[in-house]
Amino acid sequence: EMPVVQDISPIFKSLKELLDSYLALPQIDKNRIYIIGLSMGGMGTYDMAIRFPEVFAAAIPICGTVHPIRLANAKGVRFRIFHGDADNVVTVEGSRMAYRALKAAGADVEYIEFPGCGHDSWTPAFNYPGFMDWLFSQKKK
């Protein structure tokens, strides 16, 4: 089970500092900041969206997981969650619970599960029809 409360790691602190340096540039559209991650990066995607929901217009965690109680803080971020139902590395139930928690919080969330797909659900996710069109059409609410 994922922890409910976690201090921000030094790596994530550095990542946020890097992100902030880009956000300070005038040519960056601050209404179109997206985050995508797979496996442990999917967990990081959830974590960053939870910690800094004001930054992201959309998040795409692929085969990640998170403690669902933490997700209420990210309800203003649009989510598209992908997972394979045969994943034996990161349990699919984590994505299912995340979807239900986001839905209950009133988030704009979509969940796509790939039957028979193992841990490499990023392959069908990145090939999902309209993947990039959906992402690039998202703007902060």
Regions found by a protein language model. Give the residues of each.
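C-terminal catalytic histidine-bearing segment of alpha/beta-hydrolase fold enzymes
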Residues: R78-F82, N88-K141
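Alpha-helical scaffolding within the catalytic cores
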Residues: L18, Y46, C63-A72, E93, ...
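Extracellular/periplasmic catalytic domains that process cell-envelope and extracellular macromolecules
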Residues: I28, M40-G41, A72-K75, A104-A105
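A conserved short beta-strand
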Residues: E54-T65
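Short beta-strand immediately N-terminal to the catalytic nucleophile in serine-hydrolase-like folds
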Residues: I35-G37, I62, F82
